[in-house]
Amino acid sequence: MVTAASEMELFLPKSYDIFWSLVILIIVAVFFYKFFLPKFQAVFDERAAKIEGGIAKAEQAQKDADEAKAKYDAQLSNARVEASKIRDDARAEASHIIADARTRAEADAAQITATAQRSIESQQQQALVSLKGEVGVLATALAGKILGSKLESDDVQSTMIDQMIAELDSDKK
């Protein structure tokens, strides 16, 4: 058993080794606690603040993006309404322009028709006057041949022409 006890002592350190190891461990722990731990804590706090700030910025950016999207949607809706209104106004104005053009065209057509009608009536009057004059000359010549003499008096010619025209008008009616 002596050998077993000596083998166990090989694995267990001596008490002074344990004591000085504990003293060094406490010194190193105090050194870490006083110098390194505050620096690490400051770095960790700074990093946590950055992360929290980044999260807050991201949330604010998301909120701003949502507001911008809502504003954009409202503007888009307003633009669509405005475009619809402009399109309807343009259609109404086009209808009004077409109606005005149609009215002017009808008025112009009526004016042209009236002018043409007056021109036709004027030409008809001129043709009738010209025809009466030629018929009168022909009638006088014919009457002169029939009567065997020439009708020389203007009054007689005029009376005869008027009678023939009156007869033609009465036959016409």
Curated annotation (Swiss-Prot):
Coiled coil location: none
Pfam families listed in its UniProt record: ATP-synt_B (PF00430)
GO molecular function terms noted in the UniProt entry: proton-transporting ATP synthase activity, rotational mechanism; proton-transporting ATPase activity, rotational mechanism
Keyword terms: ATP synthesis, Cell membrane, CF(0), Hydrogen ion transport, Ion transport, Membrane, Transmembrane, Transmembrane helix, Transport
Major localization class: membrane
Domain of life the protein comes from: Bacteria
Keyword field contains Metal-binding: no
Gene3D superfamilies for this protein: F1F0 ATP synthase subunit B, membrane domain
GO CC terms of this entry: plasma membrane; proton-transporting ATP synthase complex
Subcellular location: Cell membrane
Membrane topology: Single-pass membrane protein
Membrane-spanning parts: 18-38
Manganese recorded as keyword: no
Family under the similarity heading: Belongs to the ATPase B chain family.
Subunit text: F-type ATPases have 2 components, F(1) - the catalytic core - and F(0) - the membrane proton channel. F(1) has five subunits: alpha(3), beta(3), gamma(1), delta(1), epsilon(1). F(0) has three main subunits: a(1), b(2) and c(10-14). The alpha and beta chains form an alternating ring which encloses part of the gamma chain. F(1) is attached to F(0) by a central stalk formed by the gamma and epsilon chains, while a peripheral stalk is formed by the delta and b chains.
Job of this protein: F(1)F(0) ATP synthase produces ATP from ADP in the presence of a proton or sodium gradient. F-type ATPases consist of two structural domains, F(1) containing the extramembraneous catalytic core and F(0) containing the membrane proton channel, linked together by a central stalk and a peripheral stalk. During catalysis, ATP synthesis in the catalytic domain of F(1) is coupled via a rotary mechanism of the central stalk subunits to proton translocation. Component of the F(0) channel, it forms part of the peripheral stalk, linking F(1) to F(0).
PANTHER family on file: ATP SYNTHASE SUBUNIT B, ATP SYNTHASE SUBUNIT B', CHLOROPLASTIC
The name this protein goes by in its record: ATP synthase subunit b
Organism: Bifidobacterium adolescentis (strain ATCC 15703 / DSM 20083 / NCTC 11814 / E194a)
